[in-house]
């Protein structure tokens, strides 16, 4: 991925790395996972033509220091890292995009530091888990049962949720089998994107910690009323991970929120519907696309 690599040293001596891509108003981007280093965001459907994307490599991913204690992969620490990044950048407020798990971190940060967020973009994420959303997820998966890749992909998903991966390399192999599930339609464009993720090295400790200790009782809803920033919530209507019902719950709880549901898109909205994604974000920013 093109761009300029940079990093900061945190108060406790860790490296926190990031990459700058494009030019224009700065948009801090927190990747998903947890445990993905940001390569999956690429240029976010060409947003780098109009914005400077500052793509964080979250703790334990990419060039950022890996914590010795897996307990450090929690929202409190992820939020603290974002605040250290803001201070390092010398900005009173940051515009913040969170994708998937990064959206959870972004909501937690915007609730903890409401005065520090100018605009908040939440992409393919959710703020809670309950039986209703679990049922929505299962319905979304059931819609894909006729696809030729489904049996292997679903088996990989079940293995991942049960933490049946020994290390980073095993998780990378698991995710390679899962990826088709994450698209509303798995065609040539989506397969080409998945090929770009072939060298991606995820952090197994971070995902294992989330699946075992965070996800079972995950609920950020009590914090959402504290978010003061204008907020754009983007969802794909075929996203089994973060279904539209999850996006509607967020938009209904944040005081100044706009909801956009993209027809036909799955989890990677910016890959499957780049024009719709780019248009929604630039409109929210009040920035026109460059010729």
Model regions: which residues?
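Conserved HGGG/HGGXW glycine-rich cap/lid loop of the alpha/beta-hydrolase fold
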Residues: 7-67, 71, 85
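Active-site loop/oxyanion-hole signature of alpha/beta-hydrolase fold enzymes
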Residues: 58-101, 279
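Conserved hydrolase catalytic core segment
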Residues: 92-136
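Flexible "cap/lid" loop of the alpha/beta hydrolase fold
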Residues: 121-161
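Alpha/beta-hydrolase
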Residues: 141, 152-222, 229
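Short beta-strand/loop motif that positions the catalytic acidic residue
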Residues: 227, 233-235
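Acidic catalytic loop of the alpha/beta-hydrolase fold
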Residues: 238-242
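Catalytic active-site module of serine/aspartate enzymes centered on a nucleophile-bearing elbow/loop
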Residues: 257-291
């Amino acid at each position: 991925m093109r761009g300029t690599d940079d990093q900061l040293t945190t108060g406790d001596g860790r490296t926190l790395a990031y990459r700058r891509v494009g030019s224009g108003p700065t948009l801090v981007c927190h990747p998903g996972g947890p445990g993905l280093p940001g390569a999956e965001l690429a240029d976010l459907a060409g947003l780098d033509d109009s914005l400077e994307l500052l793509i964080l490599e979250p703790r334990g991913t990419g060039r950022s220091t890996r914590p010795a204690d897996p307990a450090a992969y929690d929202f409190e620490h992820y939020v603290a890292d974002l605040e250290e990044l803001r201070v390092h950048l010398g900005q009173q407020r940051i515009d913040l995009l969170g994708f998937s798990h990064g959206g959870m971190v972004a909501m937690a940060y915007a609730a903890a530091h409401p005065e520090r967020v100018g605009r908040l973009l939440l992409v393919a994420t959710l703020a809670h888990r309950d039986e209703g959303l679990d049922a929505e997820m299962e319905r979304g998966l059931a819609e894909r049962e006729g696809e030729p890749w489904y049996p292997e992909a679903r088996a990989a998903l079940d293995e991942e949720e049960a933490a049946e991966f020994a290390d980073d390399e095993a998780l990378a192999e698991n995710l390679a089998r899962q990826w088709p599930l994450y698209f509303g339609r798995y065609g040539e464009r989506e397969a080409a994107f998945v090929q770009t993720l072939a060298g991606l090295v995820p952090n197994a400790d971070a995902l294992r910690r989330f699946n075992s200790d965070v996800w079972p009782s995950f609920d950020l809803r009590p914090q959402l009323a504290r978010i003061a920033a204008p907020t754009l919530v983007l969802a794909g209507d075929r996203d089994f991970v973060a279904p539209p019902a999850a996006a509607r719950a967020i938009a209904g709880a944040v005081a100044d929120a706009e909801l956009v549901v993209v027809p036909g898109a799955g989890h990677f909205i910016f890959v499957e519907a780049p024009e719709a994604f780019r248009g929604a974000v630039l409109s929210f920013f009040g920035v026109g696309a460059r010729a």
